[in-house]
Amino acid sequence: MRVRRSAVLLSVAAILLVGAAFVIFADRQDRSTEATTSGTADAAPASAPDLPTAASPAVGALFIEDAHYCTASVVHSQQGDVLLTAAHCIHDGEGGGYLTGISFAPGYHDGVAPFGYWTVSDELVAPGWSASSDPDLDVGFATAHQAGATRSLESLVGANTLATGSEFEQAITLTGYPDDSEVPAVCRNTTSRQDAYQLKVDCAGFPTGTSGGPWVVGEDPKTRLGTVIGVIGGFEYGGDDPDTSYSSYFDKDVLALYRQTTART
């Protein structure tokens, strides 16, 4: 379990309130297998940012108060403000509500937020997650805004594009922020099929805090951007073994969530 039992969330449980329940309705029995992407293969920033770590600056840590507890990444959108993470990073699931007071620090490392902290809002998860904590729908979207910003988040750090209906076996780059580390963990390996609605990958050193970390295929070695096909989550909230991670399969339900998020930003 990558986040729900972390000391970070326990310490701030008193501030977790029920948010607005933005939901969509999708047929869970009719899974699309047609590959779909959200845009071009490489939504690069307007100017190349410095890359002080092995991770893409489009990946960052989610914070509540002064502690990071999950991982998120920027996904391409016309507005340039959309984040992708695990549903359990922004919503408590069955019987719970949306978390509040979240901020996002893209490119975070060594206690430094090189692009500042961005307020997370407009969180969105599928009804199957909010009603029953369905591990096959452990995917969430949100938007990120910074007071006084003159450029969009995506124009500063770039963005991965979203793909649905992808192959189960693909070479990926996996990135996540362990909650006991100030630098991101990065691993490259090939995914496999856990079941009809779940992916898995073996990558050592992805413990609590890495939930929501993106699974990126076709990473550009210069920009470190590519196409995201999953996030750490799903089965056992991403897995109870830090050396094996899981993701809900990105299908038409995920695409519908993305489209609903971009339609209201």
Predicted regions and their residues:
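Catalytic Cys-His active-site segments of thiol-dependent hydrolases/isopeptidases
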Residues: 83-87, 106, 174-176, 224-234
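Catalytic histidine site
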Residues: 51-109, 191-195, 203
